[in-house]
A protein has these predicted regions:
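Glycine/serine-rich anion-binding loops at beta->alpha junctions
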Residues: 90-106, 141-147, 279
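ATP/NTP phosphate-donor binding region
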Residues: 1-92
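Short Gly/Thr/Asp-enriched flexible loops that form oxyanion-binding sites at enzyme active sites
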Residues: 52, 80-82, 101-115, 149-152
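Short glycine/serine/threonine-rich phosphate/pyrophosphate-binding segments
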Residues: 20-23, 44-48, 75-78, 100-105, ...
Length: 390
């Protein structure tokens, strides 16, 4: 295992059924003014909103609501949230929802007291946060992003056709997160499986890099096997607690920075997928699904040993009588079968991607250097063309 690193994660997790009962003891650590952030209103239908608000009122909190956070939070919405937070001098931002809601809460937490344009400072120039940060807590209702235990925050600027993710330091991580697997039971299937693939993609982005014997790779193989097993159960039985709890826990560990330690990481699938999202506003997990197979088939020759290992250790491909390339190809074929089994979108046209967009999407994709192949913009266009053939 190469490299030197420090590992620390400041987020306190409460995991399991009825874990919302721990919210009052966390609320007691913060001041009176709480900004309650949530999405389109599903939490009002399933009773979570009522339960959270009651605990806030019982705790003597003054609640300022910021509803309507969209699946790909926009810059305009961020400015609105900053205004609410600053005008009301909120002491805590409580995000109740999925990854987009938690991402948005973190964006508001660092941006509300920014003296210049936070988009320019924190998302374009990637400057360090040097202003007051409002603490964030999270009540998770949808799995996928891992935002409940990391500093990640993705914001979309439609005017610039840009969707940019910023990974802030541990001072922006949620102070606490509450994870009750039963809150995920009623999620529509499309959103559920998109979240499952978001989890898988987070792991693969960190797995397909490096050539050393790295403990992190063994951890990721175990997470992938558990995810494949449990997701197959969950799509058949959405209220299977064991499966949904396993998936919720995998999602957290996939992106809480642990498995990236000692590794370079890739993230090109996310760069291309986020650029697709900036043009189409498509569901994030589905953009990753559409890009993944063409991308991995493109880079496979440059990381053949790892793709062979992936096939054998994750998909149980039998190596006998096969070349290394055939083994690697069989692994990606098994992954494709699994993706089709779940009903994931593999064709970009289903997401609103058309030939006229490809150059723009490629130009909007940041080029990273942590994987097995540093792409050119022309290669990204070719990968995007393959997504339209699936």
């Amino acid at each position: 295992m190469l490299g030197k690193f420090v590992y620390s994660n400041p987020t306190k997790l409460y995991f399991g059924e009825n874990s919302l009962e721990n919210l009052p003891q966390e609320l007691a650590c913060y001041g009176k003014n709480v900004m309650l952030v949530y999405g389109g209103g599903s939490i009002k239908k399933n009773g979570i909103y009522e339960n959270v608000v009651k605990l806030l009122r019982d705790g003597g909190k003054t609640v300022f609501e910021d509803a309507g956070v969209m699946p790909n939070p926009t810059l305009e919405k961020l400015y609105e949230g900053c205004r609410i937070a600053k005008e009301n001098k909120v002491d805590l931002i409580l995000a109740v929802g999925g990854g987009s809601v938690c991402d948005y809460a973190k964006a508001v937490s660092v941006s509300a007291y920014c003296e210049t344009d936070p988009w320019e400072k924190y998302y374009l120039r990637m400057e360090a946060v040097d202003n007051k940060i409002i603490p964030v807590g999270c009540v998770l209702t949808m799995v996928g992003t891992g935002s409940e235990m990391n500093g990640g925050s993705v914001i979309t600027n439609h005017a610039a056709k840009a969707k940019i993710g910023r990974v802030f330091g541990d001072n922006v991580f949620p102070r606490f997160s509450i994870l009750d697997p039963t809150y995920t039971f009623t999620l529509p299937r499309y959103q559920m499986v998109a979240g499952f693939f978001d989890i898988m993609s987070h792991i693969l982005e960190q797995y397909f890099s490096g050539t050393d014997d790295n403990t992190s790779d063994y951890l990721m193989e175990g997470l992938l096997r558990s995810l494949i097993h449990s997701s197959r159960i969950a799509v058949q039985s959405p209220e299977d607690y064991e499966a949904r709890s396993n998936i919720m826990w995998i999602a957290t560990w996939a992106l809480n920075t642990l498995v990236a330690k000692g590794k370079s990481t890739d993230w090109m699938v996310h760069m291309i997928g986020q650029s697709i999202g900036a043009y189409t506003d498509a569901t994030h997990g589905m953009t990753l699904a559409a890009v993944s197979l063409p991308y991995y088939r493109h880079i496979m020759p440059y990381g053949l040993a790892k793709f062979k290992r992936f096939a054998i250790n994750v998909w149980d491909v039998r190596p006998e009588g096969k070349t290394d390339e055939q083994i690697a190809q069989a692994g990606l074929a098994a992954m494709e079968s699994y993706m089709r089994e779940l009903g994931l979108v593999l064709n970009g046209r289903e997401l609103g991607v058309y030939e006229t967009m490809l150059d723009g999407i490629a130009q909007g994709s940041f080029i990273l250097e942590g994987g097995y192949k540093v792409l050119t913009k022309e290669e990204i266009v070719e990968i995007l063309k393959e997504t339209l053939k699936a």
